[in-house]
Amino acid sequence: MYKRQVDSKTSTGTAVFTVYETGEYTVEATQGGQSTSGTVNVTASTTSYAITLAFVSDTLNDNDWDTISEVSDAGEGANYWAIGDRKQVTLNGTVGSLSLSNFSTYAFIIGFNHNSGREGSGRIHFQLAKTALSGGTDICFTDGQYLNTGSSAAFRMNTSNTNSGGWEDSYMRNNICGTSKSTTSGRIMGAIPAELRNALKSVTKYTNNNGSSSASSAVTATTDYFFLLSEYEVFGNITYSNSYEANYQQQYAYYSAGNSKVKYRHNSTGSAAYWWLRSPRVSHSNNFVNVNTSGSVNSSNAHDSLGFAPGFCV
């Protein structure tokens, strides 16, 4: 193998060099005591080859979302970071009826390659949110309609009191979370930074998408970017939702480790909140499951406005 060392201190971080033999070349970059490398297979003398090298910090928050995504693609997230590690996110925009302006919060890791056989590999699963890089408070987002029923834009599962259609057809999924990177108005998708939006990966989630049915056939797949967690993903058991959801889901590592399930209102962090899960309650045509203010499983009417604590994958 032909070897050539190139030292570059260009402002762009780009180095260009010529090799004189075909074959596999290792390219290494060093910066601030960190090193990273990759290989290029040169097969023709008249072709230009490019490789992008990223420096990865073992402090999650010191990495940009592109770097986090590349580490995730390689299935290496757990080699750098830990469950519960946090990354700052600034939110701007209106989600439902909640207006957020330069709201700084922290996404935290809840799983590495979680349930990858069904949901997809090369994914780090996050949830929103915490108030600080360390310590702080677990929060969910609450709007001016919190604990009220109604049909207006708010953090409701549906604008009418029904769980028909389950998670798939819910107002929460389609109008608050959003199902496309390009449909952003009124959705959390539109409030996140563009860098995070570009790094988002779709995930396959299984849920009772019938509503009140207890049949196995009611549990079907959706493709999501933002999603609510399910009863089983949080608690590791089923109390109110379709028992067959457990056949397709796994409890998130963050919650199986015993971390608190209690979340507080983002705009009143001394007040614990009810926060929605995506699972419909079986044998109740108007309820979805949620987590109550003591961190226990609960269910409420679909048109109630409760706390919003979405997950996403990078």
Segments predicted by a language model, with ranges:
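Conserved small/polar residues in nucleotide/adenosyl-binding loops
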Residues: 1-5
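Collagenous Gly-X-Y triple-helix signature in extracellular proteins
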Residues: 55-314
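Glycine-centered tight beta-turn/hairpin loop motif at sheet-sheet or coil-to-beta transitions
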Residues: 12, 33-35, 100-104
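Intrinsic-disorder/low-complexity, polar/charged segments enriched in Ser/Thr/Lys/Arg/Asp/Glu/Gln
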Residues: 14-16, 24, 35-37, 46-50, ...
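Short, acidic Ser/Thr/Gly-rich low-complexity loop/linker segments typical of extracellular
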Residues: 6-18
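Structured interaction patches on ligand/partner-binding surfaces of diverse proteins
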Residues: 9, 30-56
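Generic structural detector for well-ordered beta-strands
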Residues: 16-18, 39-41, 108
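A short, solvent-exposed beta-strand micro-motif common in secreted/extracellular proteins
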Residues: 21-32
